[in-house]
Amino acid sequence: MQKILLMVDKISTRAGQISAISVVLLTALICWEVFSRYVLSNPHDWVFDITYMLYGIMFMMAGAYTLSKNGHVRGDVLYGFFKPRTQALFDLILYFIFFIPGIIALVYAGIDFAAVSVAINEHTTQTANGPPIWPFKMIIPIAGGLLLLQGFAEIIRCIVCLQAGEWPKREHDVEEVDVDKLKAMVSHEDEKKGA
């Protein structure tokens, strides 16, 4: 069971890492457009459309990645004091009441939304010669499907935690820098040099 959970985590992590490229593309595109507009006096109409599409891709594809890292915001005022079994019970109830129905609705509506867009070869209407928007709209059901897959993995994690009394391990990825640990490490290094 743990292998399956880690495999789903890995899929979500890879999808998040691949979509993180949109941050680099978005930054480069905005920098180029600022240079082109103010230095070359040659702005491009389509850049606005592409930037909001890249921004949307970044956030839609980050959902499953964030869920796989248990990184979504939650009210930890009481939750953090609960034992793992109680946490798992609350999570399990909330996954079935809110998460699964909401994500299924997202995928269902997203498939129709994308299919219509592909069928009519939809282009953006923000600019006169807007780029095609159907590739962007196809991301909606894909991101929803990845989020649903990760949600099922989280439900399995809750069930395992209810049985075992502790949370199963997650796939490790690059973590945020813990400032306190970093300060302690630097002060420890400074103490070594001073001694």
Region roles according to the model:
Residues M1-A195:
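Alpha-helical transmembrane segments and membrane-interface helix-loop junctions
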